[in-house]
Amino acid sequence: MTVVMEQFHGEPPHLQVVARGLTEAGARGDWYAREILLLSAAGKVWQQGIVRIDLDQIDPATAALIRQARLPLGRVLINAGLLREVQHVALVKVVPGRHLATLFGGESGRVPAGSRATYGRVAEISLGGVPAVELLEIVAPQ
């Protein structure tokens, strides 16, 4: 949804990592996960996301860029020229709990007035025909 956010807001998003984790390589691959916010240059939250990616499905240079967490995952994959197919998309209505409300509304943990519910998607992204990314993206209430 990186490109959609760029087009809608008229500027590239800034990335803020809320949390991250890396599992050791094993039978299920080398998985990297993170929770992020996409923000405007002024710091307004546009979107919250949680993503898990099988780093074994991409080249080492692209994996390093993902771990650096300077750009949204979508932008890294696009810049790397990887063939992406978004599939198994489910749209969800979300009523933010304390954690998400805090991310969207600041320290008070309050969602902006009149915005109790918001929407997002759950999806899987295949890279070169192989399932490699699982994601949840939730748009911040306006």
Predicted ranges, named:
Residues 1-142:
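Composition-driven recognition of glycine/serine/threonine/acidic- and proline-rich low-complexity segments
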